[in-house]
Swiss-Prot record:
The gene is ihfB. Gene3D superfamilies: IHF-like DNA-binding proteins (4.10.520.10). This protein is one of the two subunits of integration host factor, a specific DNA-binding protein that functions in genetic recombination as well as in transcriptional and translational control. One of its GO terms (cellular component) is chromosome. The keyword Transcription applies. This is Integration host factor subunit beta. It comes from Paraburkholderia xenovorans (strain LB400). Heterodimer of an alpha and a beta chain. SUPFAM superfamilies: IHF-like DNA-binding proteins.
Length: 107
């Protein structure tokens, strides 16, 4: 599902929301989450999962063109850990055959 599909589904599910307002709501939520992660905070959405940061230590890598050793500095990368309810919901559907995505399935 893309951001635009999420906006469309939100506007469909809540007819009182204009598409523009649904887009604003999704953008605001994603901006707030991005800002929280950028500031080193953890985000927890009960039943869905949590977003946090994992530290990747510095290491010695290789330049693929020249083969020269280069130092890759440490960095922090976003990480998502699914919650129990989400894991169970996905697991229940794991035995079903995959089908083409239909945006109306989740309504």
């Amino acid at each position: 599902m893309t951001k635009s599909e999420l906006v469309a589904q939100l506007a469909t599910r809540f007819p009182q929301l204009v598409l523009k307002d649904a887009d604003f709501a999704v953008k605001t939520m994603l901006d707030a989450m991005s800002e929280a992660l950028a500031n080193g905070h953890r985000i927890e959405i009960r039943g869905f999962g949590s977003f946090g940061l994992n530290r990747r230590p510095s290491r010695v890598g290789r330049n693929p063109k020249s083969g020269e050793k280069v130092l890759v500095p440490e960095k922090y990368v976003p990480h998502f850990k699914p919650g129990k309810e989400l894991r169970e919901r996905v697991d229940r559907r794991a035995g079903e055959p995959l089908k083409a995505e239909d945006p109306d399935d989740d309504l």
